[in-house]
């Protein structure tokens, strides 16, 4: 189910896949990717309070990267849902970008129970041993716990937004269909349709009528992993839903972009479309009261 997305993120040049996975979750991330892309964005932490925190979710402790303006409270909240490779330097950087704009941004490690991605020697092994074993139900519970944590630690849950990328883009749609506290959501190249199983019993387009927050979907027209037909069907289901959140939702397709066009650390990065998508995302959150 995830192979095209994975292939689109892995450059077609010789390099160690073990090194890539380890670097993605570790401190040597930048060193591993800078030779691939000189456009990698690094946002400093000046004026910010950044840390890894522990969030209690059921019987588990879920680590999360958190960034917010230093010394501030009662902040709007953005939950950042990681891509297929987990919480790595790019996801942390996105949190800092939001924090620079005045948000409490937090990215929980939604693979925490299933294992450490850096321990797997290949992308295929990572998918088989970790990603495929993460049930949607667990993800929703951990995201709910993250929201509660933010509300008790300086966040204003009346101004709650969620955004996610790749694997996390799909989860963004699902969470916006689940949690009534979400004011707005932005899903970056997340699947809206696909195979179902015990771990993923339904897809976003199955529950479009249950959408509780206006959601902006940002997609690439050349994304081999997400068909334009599935996006057209999602638009149709949103239009037919009749709810305000569904009516206000929007799907934008960048014709010349592929999957992961926002991932500035990969060759898939398309700067013009990434910049436009970021501007749209920030405007979306502000328009819907997440500021």
Residue positions per predicted region:
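Gly/Ser-rich "nucleophile elbow"/oxyanion-hole loop immediately N-terminal to the catalytic nucleophile
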Residues: 121-161, 290
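Primarily recognizes the serine-hydrolase "nucleophile elbow" in alpha/beta-hydrolase
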Residues: 145-207
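N-terminal cap/lid segment of alpha/beta-hydrolase-fold proteins
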Residues: 39-70
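Short beta-strand element of the alpha/beta-hydrolase
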Residues: 74-83
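N-terminal secretory signal peptides
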Residues: 1-15
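N-terminal export leaders
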Residues: 15-30
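C-terminal catalytic histidine-bearing segment of alpha/beta-hydrolase fold enzymes
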Residues: 244-291
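Short beta-strand/loop motif that positions the catalytic acidic residue
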Residues: 211, 217-219
């Amino acid at each position: 189910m995830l192979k095209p997305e994975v292939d689109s993120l892995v450059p077609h040049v010789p390099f160690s896949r073990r090194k890539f996975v380890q670097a993605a979750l570790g401190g040597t991330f930048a060193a591993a990717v800078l030779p691939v892309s000189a456009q990698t964005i690094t946002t400093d932490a000046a004026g910010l309070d950044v840390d890894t925190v522990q969030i209690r979710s059921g019987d588990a402790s879920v680590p999360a990267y958190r960034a917010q303006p230093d010394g501030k409270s009662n902040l709007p909240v953005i939950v950042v849902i990681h891509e297929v490779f987990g919480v790595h330097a790019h996801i942390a950087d996105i949190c800092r970008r939001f924090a620079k704009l005045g948000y409490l941004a937090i990215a929980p490690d939604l693979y925490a129970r299933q294992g450490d991605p850096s321990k797997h020697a290949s992308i295929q092994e990572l998918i088989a041993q970790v990603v495929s074993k993460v049930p949607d139900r667990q993800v929703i519970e951990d995201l709910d716990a993250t929201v509660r944590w933010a509300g008790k630690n300086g966040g204003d849950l009346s101004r709650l937004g969620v955004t996610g990328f790749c694997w996390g883009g799909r989860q963004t749609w699902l969470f916006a269909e689940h949690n009534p506290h979400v004011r707005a959501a932005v899903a970056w190249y997340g699947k809206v349709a696909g195979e179902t199983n015990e771990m993923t019993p339904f897809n976003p387009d199955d529950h479009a009528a249950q959408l509780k927050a206006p959601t902006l979907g940002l997609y690439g027209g050349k994304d081999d992993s997400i068909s334009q037909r599935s996006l057209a069907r999602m638009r149709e289901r949103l239009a037919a839903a009749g709810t305000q959140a569904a009516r206000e939702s929007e799907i934008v397709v960048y014709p010349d972009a592929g999957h992961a066009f926002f991932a500035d650390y990969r060759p898939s990065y398309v700067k013009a479309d990434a910049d436009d998508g970021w501007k749209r995302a920030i405007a979306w959150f502000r328009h819907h009261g997440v500021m």
